[in-house]
């Protein structure tokens, strides 16, 4: 029997599984990020436009994060002593992960650490080995994953009038 644990000849009945290693190697962890910025202007106006994209695959299967961002800023002297500042910032974020505790990715890692190597992962018949009714392999195979999407757009503007009176200016601000 001990030999079967050592050589892995009967992994369903005599498993020797490093559950944490299996879990952390189930995803690629690959990430790529791209950014593009355009800046310009003239004597009275300057602007900056920046867009970004990041796609990050999780170290565990079925976990990922995709994020797109955009930023626009402009500063312009629209008349002598009258300055306009505009800022617009937006993002879209998609996060895929296990659903809820203790089945969240943190819970899965915690149970993978606790799960002894003598409990099978996924067996040849498709069932799973369990300790205390928890199996990281079973959670990862389940459909209980969610996609959280968050989006935000914020904008602000400021109009500054530097009056002819030395040291006196008026500032108006708006934001959403």
Predicted segments with their positions:
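Surface-exposed loop/interface segments of Gram-negative outer-membrane beta-barrel transport/assembly proteins
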Residues: 1-16, 58-65, 69-154, 169-176
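Residues embedded in well-ordered regular secondary structure
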Residues: 1-61, 99-102, 143, 160
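Short secondary-structure junctions and interdomain/linker hinges
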Residues: 119, 161-166
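Alpha-helical support elements that line or immediately flank enzyme active sites
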Residues: 156-163, 176
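Secondary-structure boundary/capping motif
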Residues: 44, 158, 168-172
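Outer-membrane beta-barrel channels and translocator barrels
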Residues: 31, 42-43, 77-79, 164-166
């Amino acid at each position: 029997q001990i030999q079967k644990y050592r050589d892995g000849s009967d992994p369903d009945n005599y498993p020797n599984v490093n559950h944490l290693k299996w879990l952390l190697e189930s995803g690629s962890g690959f990430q790529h990020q791209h950014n593009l910025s355009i800046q310009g202007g003239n004597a009275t106006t300057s602007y900056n436009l920046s867009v970004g994209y990041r796609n990050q695959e999780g170290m565990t299967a079925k976990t990922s994060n995709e994020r797109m961002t955009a930023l626009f800023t402009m500063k312009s002297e629209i008349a002598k002593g009258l300055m306009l500042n505009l800022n617009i910032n937006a993002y879209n974020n998609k996060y895929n992960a296990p659903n809820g505790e203790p089945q969240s990715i943190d819970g899965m890692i915690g149970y993978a650490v606790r799960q002894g190597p003598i409990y099978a992962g996924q067996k040849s018949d498709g069932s799973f080995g369990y300790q205390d009714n928890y199996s990281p392999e079973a959670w990862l195979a389940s459909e209980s994953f969610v996609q959280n999407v968050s989006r935000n757009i914020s904008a602000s503007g400021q109009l500054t009038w530097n009056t002819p009176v030395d040291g006196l200016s008026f500032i108006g601000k708006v934001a959403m």
